[in-house]
C-alpha cells in the first residue's frame, strides 16, 4: 500500500481493480484543515486520464505490474508482436495499446513492455533511437539561418524537424519523448 506521501510521479497504483500510473502528484497542506494529495493518473489499459484526491489518512494499493524488455517483431495488420529475447516468449498488443508508441516502432528494436497479470498492456520506446531519414526536402545552399530546420520523416514513420544539412539516408539520434532531433548518429 502507498500512503498519500508516497504517491509520486511514475508510481503505479491499483484503482478500481485496474493499473494506473501517476502522471502528476501535488501534496497540499492548507492552512486550515487536513492535508491531502491530489493526483492525476493515466489508465495503463485504455489510456484514460483522471484526477483523484486522497486525504492524509488514505492509502492506495500498488499495481503489480512488471516491465520487461522485449524485441518488436512485426505487425500482422491487427496486432503488434513482441518477443522476450531471454525466454523467446511472445506477446501481442492491439493497435490501441501501442497507439502512443506506434510512430517509433522499428523491427528488431528493444522496447519496454508492461505486463499485468501476465498480459501485455503497454509499450514504451527507448528514450533515444537512431533512425534513418526516409523523406526530407533538400537543403538549399546559402539557406543557413542559425537554428533553421526542415520537416523530415524517419524510417519508423514519425515526422520530426531536422537541421537543413540533414539529407535522405542520414542516420540521426532522436529523443522519442519529445520527438526532437538530437544529433547525427555516429558511425
From Swiss-Prot:
Keywords assigned by UniProt, alphabetized: Cytoplasm, Elongation factor, Protein biosynthesis
Main location: cytoplasm
Protein name as catalogued: Elongation factor P
Role noted for this protein: Involved in peptide bond synthesis. Stimulates efficient translation and peptide-bond synthesis on native or reconstituted 70S ribosomes in vitro. Probably functions indirectly by altering the affinity of the ribosome for aminoacyl-tRNA, thus increasing their reactivity as acceptors for peptidyl transferase.
NCBIfam families recorded: efp, PRK00529.1
GO molecular function: translation elongation factor activity
Family note: Belongs to the elongation factor P family.
GO BP: any one term: peptide biosynthetic process
GO cellular component: cytoplasm
Pfam family, one: EFP
Pathway field: Protein biosynthesis; polypeptide chain elongation
PROSITE patterns for the chain: EFP
Chain's gene name: efp
Location of the protein in the cell: Cytoplasm
InterPro entries: Elong-fact-P_C (IPR015365), NA-bd_OB-fold (IPR012340), Rib_uL2_dom2 (IPR014722), Transl_elong_fac_P/YeiP (IPR020599), Transl_elong_KOW-like (IPR013185), Transl_elong_P/YeiP_cen (IPR001059), Transl_elong_P/YeiP_CS (IPR013852), Transl_elongation_fac_P (IPR011768)
Amino acid at each position: 500500500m502507498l500512503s498519500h506521501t508516497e504517491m509520486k510521479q511514475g508510481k503505479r497504483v491499483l484503482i478500481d481493480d485496474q493499473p494506473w500510473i501517476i502522471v502528476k502528484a501535488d501534496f497540499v497542506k492548507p492552512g486550515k484543515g487536513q492535508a491531502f494529495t491530489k493526483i492525476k493518473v493515466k489508465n495503463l489499459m485504455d489510456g484514460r486520464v483522471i484526477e483523484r484526491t486522497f486525504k492524509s489518512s488514505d492509502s492506495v494499493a500498488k499495481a503489480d505490474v512488471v516491465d520487461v524488455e522485449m524485441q518488436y517483431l512485426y505487425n500482422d495488420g491487427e496486432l503488434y508482436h513482441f518477443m522476450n529475447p531471454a525466454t523467446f516468449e511472445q506477446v501481442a498488443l492491439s493497435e490501441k495499446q501501442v497507439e502512443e508508441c506506434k510512430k517509433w516502432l522499428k523491427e528488431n528494436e528493444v522496447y519496454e513492455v508492461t505486463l499485468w497479470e501476465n498480459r501485455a498492456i503497454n509499450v514504451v520506446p527507448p528514450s533515444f533511437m537512431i533512425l534513418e531519414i526516409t523523406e526530407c526536402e533538400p537543403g538549399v545552399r546559402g539557406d543557413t539561418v542559425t537554428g533553421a530546420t526542415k520537416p523530415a520523416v524517419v524510417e519508423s514513420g514519425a515526422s520530426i524537424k531536422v537541421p537543413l544539412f540533414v539529407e535522405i539516408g542520414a542516420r540521426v539520434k532522436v529523443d522519442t519523448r519529445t520527438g526532437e532531433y538530437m544529433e547525427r548518429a555516429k558511425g
